[in-house]
Each structure stands twice: as structure tokens, then as C-alpha cells.
């Protein structure tokens, strides 16, 4: 129970961290790409 609980917590933490990181990375990448090509969302 303790191990599975810890793994579940780690999975949720990693999922949230990856989601936020990917969102921020994509936002920054797309924003930079849009600016470099003069594209507005």
C-alpha cells in the first residue's frame, strides 16, 4: 500500500510536471515561431 501510494503520488506529480513543462515549452516555442514569421494567434 505504501509503495503503490508513493508511486501513485510520483506518477501524478510527474504527469502534472510534464504537462506544465510541455505547455510552457510549446507556448514559448510557438510564440517564438509566430513572432519570427510574423504570425499572430
UniProtKB/Swiss-Prot annotation:
Region annotation 7 X 4 AA tandem repeats of W-M-D-G: where it falls in the sequence: 9-32
Alphabetical UniProt keywords: Repeat
Sequence repeat copies, ranges: 9-12, 13-16, 17-20, 21-24, 25-28, 29-32
Identification of the protein by name: Uncharacterized protein C03B1.10
Native source species: Caenorhabditis elegans
